[in-house]
C-alpha cells in the first residue's frame, strides 16, 4: 500500500500508479452519478467528488462499489475522510483528475 503519494504524482506518471493501492486523506464534497463527461468512471456508477489528498486542493473521483453506497450516503459535506483505494486512472481523460476505486473509508476529525 502506498502512503504519501500525491495526486500531482499520479497525474504526472499515470501508468506507474495504475492498479496500485494507496491510502489518502480527502475532503468529501458530494456523491455524484457518472455521466459522459467522466468516461473513466462507468456510466451510471456512484462516485464521490472529493478534494485532496491533503494538503492538495485538486479534485479526485472515488468510484463507490455497491456494498459501500449506504456508508457514503451518510457522509456530511466537507467531512474529512481517509480512504484505501486502487488507482483506476492517474489522470482522467477530459478533466485530468485521478480516479480511484474505493476499498475502505473512515471518517476522520
Regions found by a protein language model. Give the residues of each.
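OB-fold and OB-like single-stranded nucleic-acid-recognition modules
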Residues: 1-109
